[in-house]
């Protein structure tokens, strides 16, 4: 085991004994198999360790200088040889025990990735069908949280009706529609890189400590000439912000995206007709004020 300053036992406010002086984190990666069925990457702990033989996401103690994202990705690489650059993080689940916290970092991959045991702490690694997870002997902490975690395995996509959002701010946008759209995208690039801590109540998902959704901004008309967003200096932003320049009706493009994008979808618009079209696809809809308050 590599020596880290987080290694060691501690007790939480409930009196339970936990590994990780500064808390701990694990990585729960989901990916579709060749038939499109979801699977998650789990490791079986070595028999000699705590909860030996139990299954759960790869994870371990957080070092004092690390974020939970760094810890989870590092542990998955150290224990399962998982390439951290091959997954996309979309959220963080927090399990607070009072003075000690375990965070599950949620991520996705386009397909099951190569993974195998590379540490003495790991007995076996497998991409397990989601429907089969509960039949395994699970780590008690993971077993307690699994039913909720299963509801947030898929990423969240926020589809932004740029014309509607820009038009809700009386800042002279009508004088330069492309410039106004560009300013909105710059703000969204910063927001996308840092994530968001809450969602509207209309979105039917369990509460996460932080979401890292993909933002899809739909531009139309003169605004479609807007420049690409400025780099906010944070690596995750480019992959979390997608620009769609509609060649026809922006509303039609938004409705199409709401119908075909996998996972949870949240459409930002105040247009009543568009709202109704998106809701028929199963997407949630919220007005521009929610998004503007985050910028």
Model-derived segments and their meaning:
Residues 49-53:
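A conserved beta-turn-beta hairpin within the catalytic core of GNAT-like acetyltransferases
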Residues 1-28, 32-34:
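Acidic, metal-coordinating catalytic segment for phosphate/diphosphate chemistry
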Residues 55-66, 173:
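Short histidine-centered catalytic/ligand-binding loop motif
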Residues 155-160, 167-295:
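Nuclease catalytic cores that cleave nucleic-acid phosphodiester bonds
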Residues 38-40:
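Entry beta-strands of beta-propeller and related beta-repeat scaffolds
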Residues 24-29, 156-162:
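Short, hydrophobic/glycine-enriched beta-strand segments
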Residues 61-154:
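Unchanged
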Residues 28, 46, 131, 163, ...:
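Anionic group-transfer/hydrolysis microenvironments
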């Amino acid at each position: 085991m590599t020596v880290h300053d987080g290694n060691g036992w501690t007790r939480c406010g409930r009196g339970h004994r936990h590994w990780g002086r500064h808390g701990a984190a694990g990585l729960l990666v989901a990916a579709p198999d060749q038939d499109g069925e979801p699977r998650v990457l789990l490791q079986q702990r070595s028999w000699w360790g705590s909860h030996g033989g139990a299954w759960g996401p790869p994870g371990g103690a957080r070092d004092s200088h690390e974020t939970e994202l760094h810890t989870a990705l590092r542990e998955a690489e150290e224990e399962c040889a998982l390439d951290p650059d091959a997954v996309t993080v979309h959220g963080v689940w927090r399990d607070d025990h009072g003075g000690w916290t375990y965070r599950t970092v949620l991520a996705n991959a386009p397909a099951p990735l190569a993974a195998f045991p590379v540490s003495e702490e790991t007995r076996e690694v497998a991409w397990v069908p989601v429907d089969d997870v509960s039949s395994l002997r699970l780590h008690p902490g993971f077993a307690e949280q699994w039913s909720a975690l299963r509801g947030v395995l898929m990423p969240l996509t926020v589809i932004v009706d740029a014309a509607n959002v820009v038009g809700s701010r009386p800042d002279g946008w009508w004088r330069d529609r492309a410039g106004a759209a560009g300013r909105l995208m710059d703000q969204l690039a910063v927001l996308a890189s840092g994530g968001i801590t809450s969602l509207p109540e209309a979105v039917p998902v369990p509460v996460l400590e932080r979401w890292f959704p993909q933002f899809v901004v739909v531009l139309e008309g003169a605004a479609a000439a807007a420049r690409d967003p400025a780099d906010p200096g944070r690596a995750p932003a480019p992959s979390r912000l997608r620009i769609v320049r509609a060649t026809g009706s922006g509303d039609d493009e938004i409705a199409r995206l709401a119908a075909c994008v996998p996972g949870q979808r949240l459409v930002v618009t105040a247009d009543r007709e568009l709202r109704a079209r998106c809701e028929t696809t199963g997407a949630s809809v919220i007005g521009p004020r929610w998004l503007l308050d985050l910028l």
